[in-house]
């Protein structure tokens, strides 16, 4: 999700929940996203994941930005929607993890523990390195529609 504020582009990012991510900030934030099941429409999955991780519904006007290949070889389909929401109001789904690792102890954590709007420069510092190309796709799209 993106919005324009004072003629600047801002992107909505989420911070993963749980003890592993608790003290990590720069390079730890993410675009709300997730896996889709076999047979599930990727755009439907994107909408579902956004709602699960934030508690917010998105608009209908999603724009396909393309596909990026992450370091591990995974192909990620990227869409964007213009919108607005209050990060203080997020309500994330919960997930179960083993913590500490290999301990056999299961704990329930929020998939996302906070969210925020960031201008593109700051978003580049905060976002997971593997997701930075998604910001490039957004910027290229916005430049294209502005001309």
Feature locations, PLM:
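Charged phosphate-binding loop/patch that engages nucleotide di/tri-phosphates or the phosphate backbone
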Residues: 116, 120-147
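Short, charged/polar surface micro-motifs in flexible loops or helix N-caps
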Residues: 6-7, 18-21, 37-38, 56, ...
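Alpha-helix-centered segments that form part of catalytic cores
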Residues: 105-121
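The catalytic Nudix box helix
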Residues: 31-65, 79, 119
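N-terminal strand-loop-strand
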Residues: 1-31, 79
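Residues that scaffold the ATP/ADP-binding catalytic core of kinase and kinase-like folds
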Residues: 23, 39, 126
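Active-site-adjacent beta-strand/loop module that shapes the phosphate/pyrophosphate-binding cleft
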Residues: 67-104, 116, 138-142
């Amino acid at each position: 999700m993106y919005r324009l504020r004072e003629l600047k582009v801002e992107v909505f990012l989420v911070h993963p929940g749980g003890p592993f991510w608790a003290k990590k900030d720069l390079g730890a934030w993410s675009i709300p996203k997730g896996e889709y099941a076999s047979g599930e429409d990727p755009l439907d999955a994107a909408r579902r994941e956004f709602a699960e991780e934030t508690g917010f519904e998105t608009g209908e006007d999603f724009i396909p930005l393309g596909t990026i290949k992450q370091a591990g070889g995974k192909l990620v389909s990227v869409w964007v929607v213009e919108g607005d929401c209050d990060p203080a109001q997020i309500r994330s789904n919960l997930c179960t993890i083993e913590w500490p690792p290999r301990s056999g102890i299961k704990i329930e954590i929020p998939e996302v523990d906070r969210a925020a709007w960031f201008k593109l420069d700051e978003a580049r510092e905060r976002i997971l390195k593997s997701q930075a190309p998604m910001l490039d796709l957004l910027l290229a799209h916005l430049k294209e529609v502005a001309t």
